[in-house]
Regions:
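Long, charged, low-complexity, helical-prone intrinsically disordered regions
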Residues: 1-137
């Protein structure tokens, strides 16, 4: 499908920013466009019964540079001051440094939320590498 770019828009050669994206972010909310741009299917699973969820209740995609490389399901334990990673899944285009980059972003998010640390406690193929990356911080 066609996409449009303003003729005066300057396109950077390479983008290296990292961000955890809300499922309600415009970049994610228009699912057809998300699939075209990033070749990933992001579905909001909050209305899906727990036993049928693939990635988690409220999953945040991780944008690493120009690629969605992972997705995480998070929960804040405010009493313990911990950001819990209930699930961490790598995307097919995940980079070798995805776990480390994600650990940094999760630590930033924890600080922003007034939490003291991040702990990977859940499932997913990225959970163990993420836990290891978090232990080095």
């Amino acid at each position: 499908k066609p996409a449009y770019l303003h003729p005066a828009a300057k396109v950077p050669r390479k983008v290296e920013a990292h961000a955890l994206l809300s499922p309600f972010d415009n970049l994610i909310w228009f699912r057809d466009r998300t699939e075209r741009l990033f070749d990933v299917k992001i579905r909001l699973e909050i209305y899906t019964p727990a036993e049928k969820r693939l990635h988690g209740y409220y999953v945040l995609p991780f944008l690493q540079g120009e690629t969605i490389t992972a997705r995480v399901d998070l929960k804040s334990d405010r009493q313990a001051k911990v950001l819990l990673v209930q699930a961490a899944h790598a995307e097919p285009d995940a980079r070798p440094d995805t776990a480390e980059a994600l650990a940094i972003e999760l630590s930033r998010m924890a600080g922003w939320l007034g939490l003291e640390r991040v702990q990977a406690v859940g499932k997913g193929d990225l959970a163990a590498p993420l836990s290891q990356a978090l232990s080095k911080m």
